[in-house]
């Protein structure tokens, strides 16, 4: 049963793509791309290179503060500008600094709605994703993914496991905030992928799931193996949309979705087996539950145990947009109309970001003396 299709039982409809929405969407794209570009050019060499050579922990704090400000534009766009309602259900989320988030992958923008949770809990700048490595090649955003230390994977176990182990080992400090997001299905849901998943499930004796794909368990196992003793909890999230699943451009133009429903199951680490085989079985059970939740959502139009969450402040939205845009205007002025040293700085910064992203270069204190920087051969 396809949850991404229109829900006939609701009166919600996708908003029409009017000329005004097109104009507003193009302006939003311009604002988001230009602000991301200038923030990365001017802040990344200072926060993610210079400061990181002195202290990785302090560098991460500054990166979180600066780029968390920019990331906040997205939840404000979704909820305050577009008028999308985010409906939470299930367990209440306390303010916790170290969590592993696992979620179903309905569409290409699921991961962006996790920011709506992190913003409310004061951890927006600390959220990191395990994502497919091809996304690191995106112009501008690839730089951002690298600076924010997202973990790129090839979806090949023999290649990905050493990368996961290496990068996760740098996040083991229990005093350092970390929201690590993982989509165990490994790809977004489509009917064709679902049929292939069901065929494979039948061949290996696993349950046939209709609304999610079979999860890949090893990545989850590695995350638990490395971080088990330092995490506060696992947030098991199930995401659904009304009236249909949005694309990235739907979000930009504000046509879809009208509602995002996020069901939360907060699980303590002691409730998840440490043994790899048993933790894999736990994850499989989690996705069987997601499948049932999504079937019920399709029939009833909601998840059980809906609960209120604070609304995002309009004043904070205005202040965030004003602050980010004002800084961007200053950076553009410095680059184009001020002393030539700013042009040189911008060029060197862009060169460094391109190099660092391509070679997965993350500096650390003393790395040039001890040859300990993380650089991968291509």
From Swiss-Prot:
Pathway: Phospholipid metabolism; CDP-diacylglycerol biosynthesis; CDP-diacylglycerol from sn-glycerol 3-phosphate: step 2/3. It is a multi-pass membrane protein. It catalyses: a 1-acyl-sn-glycero-3-phosphate + an acyl-CoA = a 1,2-diacyl-sn-glycero-3-phosphate + CoA. The keyword RNA-binding does not apply. Widely expressed at low level. One of its GO terms (biological process) is CDP-diacylglycerol biosynthetic process. One of its GO terms (cellular component) is membrane. SMART domains: PlsC (SM00563). It comes from the Eukaryota. CDD domains: LPLAT_LCLAT1-like. A motif (HXXXXD motif) lies at residues 105-110. It is an enzyme of class 2 (transferase). Its EC number is 2.3.1.51. GO terms for molecular function: 1-acylglycerol-3-phosphate O-acyltransferase activity. Its main location: membrane. The chain crosses the membrane at residues 26-46, 62-82, 317-337. It is found in: Membrane. Keywords: Acyltransferase, Lipid biosynthesis, Lipid metabolism, Membrane, Phospholipid biosynthesis, Phospholipid metabolism, Transferase, Transmembrane, Transmembrane helix. May convert lysophosphatidic acid (LPA) into phosphatidic acid by incorporating acyl moiety at the 2 position. Has no activity when expressed in bacteria or yeast. The HXXXXD motif is essential for acyltransferase activity and may constitute the binding site for the phosphate moiety of the glycerol-3-phosphate. Belongs to the 1-acyl-sn-glycerol-3-phosphate acyltransferase family. This is Probable 1-acyl-sn-glycerol-3-phosphate acyltransferase 4.
